[in-house]
């Protein structure tokens, strides 16, 4: 009888330990997903909001403040949802042209996130 009770106690203890371990694994996965983009994590190549006064694009995840990014967008750029700077506002023959992507205008967006004349 004592052996059966001991086996049952061991089984319950093992089951409890496995359950607790599973819960802790799930909890750590959840926290990893929630914290995969920490403030000031240097994974952005641009900045939200367009430098010193361009069009303000939607604030993308992982790129909430200028300090979250490796580099800052020049005026007129903003950070895309992929945390890449894209061109937004350029001057073409003294006319302001809005360009959300390179194909919207005759200019090309450089890797730094500003528009320059296509060479």
Curated annotation (Swiss-Prot):
Name of protein: Defensin-like protein 260
Species for this entry: Arabidopsis thaliana
Compartment list: Secreted
Membrane-spanning ranges: none
Superkingdom, natural source: Eukaryota
Disulfide bonds: 44-99, 63-79, 69-83, 73-85
Family: Belongs to the DEFL family.
Keyword flag Signal: yes
Taxonomic lineage from the root: Eukaryota, Viridiplantae, Streptophyta, Embryophyta, Tracheophyta
GO biological process, any: defense response to fungus
Signal peptide (UniProt feature, chain positions): 1-24
Primary location group: secreted
Recorded GO CC terms: extracellular region
UniProt KW keywords: Antimicrobial, Disulfide bond, Fungicide, Plant defense, Secreted, Signal
